[in-house]
């Protein structure tokens, strides 16, 4: 089983996160940031992983530290669970519609960190959630997983729908990339390592 558990404690947050890439049971997610709980639940469902997150953070300031530190911890868990990345597809991509919005994700578990985030999130807040934190979250995930991650909203009007399409697309693309392919011997790279 490809699993990982991490605890990250700073002066601003305390994060406990575990992931199982090969088993999907109901995830338990409690971050103190309601909108992020919703998005992480969607991500877990569409990536077909079990994700457990317990976070306490300085949300009385705002959600920035909590969102970023969860992204860091998720990225570190993904990196550990994937280990040497033997026999995985490595690449994944997905288009996901959410009503009037269309989101796209392409990723490469290459060992090289990069984020391209192309999404016009016209509403700066959804409830108490600052929508600029979506990019911060994905930046933290990409750099700590060491993945090349491209996210784009092709069109849409509703900011909630745009973000939801991105999280679902990320989940579906990740599932494709982490799937073990019996036709791939070793790692999917001419270098011999990822």
Curated annotation (Swiss-Prot):
Signal sequence region: none
Pathway the protein contributes to: Amino-acid biosynthesis; L-histidine biosynthesis; L-histidine from 5-phospho-alpha-D-ribose 1-diphosphate: step 6/9
An annotated Gene Ontology molecular function: imidazoleglycerol-phosphate dehydratase activity
Keyword Isomerase on entry: no
Catalysed reactions, semicolon-separated: D-erythro-1-(imidazol-4-yl)glycerol 3-phosphate = 3-(imidazol-4-yl)-2-oxopropyl phosphate + H2O
Compartment(s) of residence: Cytoplasm
A single cellular component GO annotation: cytoplasm
InterPro entries the record matches: IGPD_sf, ImidazoleglycerolP_deHydtase, ImidazoleglycerP_deHydtase_CS, Ribosomal_Su5_D2-typ_SF
Principal localisation: cytoplasm
UniProt key word Cell wall biogenesis/degradation: no
Keyword field: Amino-acid biosynthesis, Cytoplasm, Histidine biosynthesis, Lyase
Enzyme class: lyase
Family matches, as SUPFAM superfamilies: Ribosomal protein S5 domain 2-like
E.C. number: 4.2.1.19
Gene Ontology biological process terms in this record: L-histidine biosynthetic process
HAMAP family: HisB
Family listed: Belongs to the imidazoleglycerol-phosphate dehydratase family.
NCBIfam families per UniProt: PRK00951.1-2 (NF002107), PRK00951.2-1 (NF002111), PRK00951.2-4 (NF002114)
Protein name per UniProt: Imidazoleglycerol-phosphate dehydratase
Organism whose genome encodes this protein: Listeria monocytogenes serovar 1/2a (strain ATCC BAA-679 / EGD-e)
